Swiss-Prot record:
Biased composition (Basic and acidic residues): 27-38
Function: Core component of the complement C1 complex, a multiprotein complex that initiates the classical pathway of the complement system, a cascade of proteins that leads to phagocytosis and breakdown of pathogens and signaling that strengthens the adaptive immune system.
PROSITE patterns: C1Q (PS50871)
GO molecular function, one term: amyloid-beta binding
Glycosylation sites: K33, K48, K67, K100, N146
Range of residues in the leader sequence: 1-22
Recorded superkingdom: Eukaryota
GO biological process, one term: complement-mediated synapse pruning
Domain comment quoted from the record: The C1q domain is the ligand-recognition domain, which specifically recognizes and binds the Fc regions of IgG or IgM immunoglobulins. The collagen-like domain interacts with C1R and C1S proenzymes.
Species of provenance: Homo sapiens
PANTHER family, alphabetized: COMPLEMENT C1Q SUBCOMPONENT SUBUNIT A, EMILIN ELASTIN MICROFIBRIL INTERFACE-LOCATED PROTEIN ELASTIN MICROFIBRIL INTERFACER
Domain Collagen-like, residue spans: 31-109
Listed name of the protein: Complement C1q subcomponent subunit A
Amino acid sequence: MEGPRGWLVLCVLAISLASMVTEDLCRAPDGKKGEAGRPGRRGRPGLKGEQGEPGAPGIRTGIQGLKGDQGEPGPSGNPGKVGYPGPSGPLGARGIPGIKGTKGSPGNIKDQPRPAFSAIRRNPPMGGNVVIFDTVITNQEEPYQNHSGRFVCTVPGYYYFTFQVLSQWEICLSIVSSSRGQVRRSLGFCDTTNKGLFQVVSGGMVLQLQQGDQVWVEKDPKKGHIYQGSEADSVFSGFLIFPSA
């Protein structure tokens, strides 16, 4: 067994030594490059690379496309601030009449103010154009001032005033009123006689008055002689018809 194995080793060493000697003593030149081989099979796809940086915008050369379909409504935003009030709208249609209310409690006429007065001339002061009826007959609520001859309104409403004045001469009288200091001549009455007989000049009217308004009788400076005697009297009266609403 050892004989053949030893011979085999010796043969291999001899061949190797011979090759080394041959290479050192006689080296042949390199041959020409061979022809390119056929392309190999396509390799497997490589791994996906990382995302690159965004490129520069391209030049827009295409035609704008058609408008797309309307998208879905977005979520509701936060409530806005309260705006300014808008202009008033047109007047609406008249509503249906409401149900009749319950009957109220009966009123008491005694609780209502009822200003009224009557005054005559007995010993009036001389001078001036205001006809002063100095003697009071009735003065409910005391609206009449006998020292000045003026009625002063304390309850706004509609009033009736009247006068009857005795004279033997030509006479002209007027019912005069004032409101907030503005005097206005309301209505005038005149009568004439040439025989010196007694005559009565009378007049009356309805006035709407506010609180503080005044009413009086005034004579014409040239035609204002009033008879003064005990056998006949001149009278000035007034009263509230109904108060203002």
